[in-house]
């Protein structure tokens, strides 16, 4: 019988002491994504409502956004992160909840920017829903 090869040993995660970073919250109607990067744009931690175990329409709720932001903040704070500049994108209901939970997790919020893309009369929008 052929022997199984042993899996390669993983390197231990090196703790980086990064004082400040950028937290990008992308909140859509269906989900909320939280990505925490250092000042160069390298991802330190990320989370989403779906990755936290929410399924279907519950991913779009403010509570799911709160849990996602908490998870990402805890992971980033293990790397030594203390303060963040928050960039919010999208029209979803989890925007404010995610910002509040970043602050409650112990991160100092230095600035809040809204970077939602707004067209200057670009593409034609989809037709209105008739329910």
Swiss-Prot record:
GO molecular function, one term: rRNA binding
Function: Located on the platform of the 30S subunit, it bridges several disparate RNA helices of the 16S rRNA. Forms part of the Shine-Dalgarno cleft in the 70S ribosome.
Family: Belongs to the universal ribosomal protein uS11 family.
PROSITE patterns: RIBOSOMAL_S11 (PS00054)
InterPro entries, per database record: Ribosomal_uS11, Ribosomal_uS11_bac-type, Ribosomal_uS11_CS, Ribosomal_uS11_sf
Name of the protein in question: Small ribosomal subunit protein uS11
Pfam family, one: Ribosomal_S11
GO (cellular component) term, any one: ribosome
Keyword Chloroplast: no
UniProt entry keywords in alphabetical sequence: Ribonucleoprotein, Ribosomal protein, RNA-binding, rRNA-binding
UniProt GO BP: translation
Gene3D superfamilies reported in the protein's UniProt record: Ribosomal protein S11 (3.30.420.80)
Self-association and partners: Part of the 30S ribosomal subunit. Interacts with proteins S7 and S18. Binds to IF-3.
């Amino acid at each position: 019988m052929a022997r199984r090869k042993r899996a390669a040993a993983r390197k231990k995660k090196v703790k980086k002491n990064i004082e400040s970073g950028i937290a990008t919250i992308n909140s859509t109607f269906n989900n909320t994504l939280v990505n925490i990067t250092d000042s160069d744009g390298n991802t330190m931690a990320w989370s989403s409502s779906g990755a936290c175990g929410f399924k279907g329409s519950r991913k779009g709720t403010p509570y799911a956004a709160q849990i996602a932001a908490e998870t990402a903040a805890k992971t980033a704070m293990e790397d030594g992160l203390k303060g963040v500049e928050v960039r919010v994108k999208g029209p979803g209901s989890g925007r404010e909840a995610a910002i509040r939970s970043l602050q409650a997790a112990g991160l100092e919020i230095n600035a809040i920017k809204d970077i939602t893309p707004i067209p200057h009369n670009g593409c034609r929008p989809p037709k209105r829903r008739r329910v």
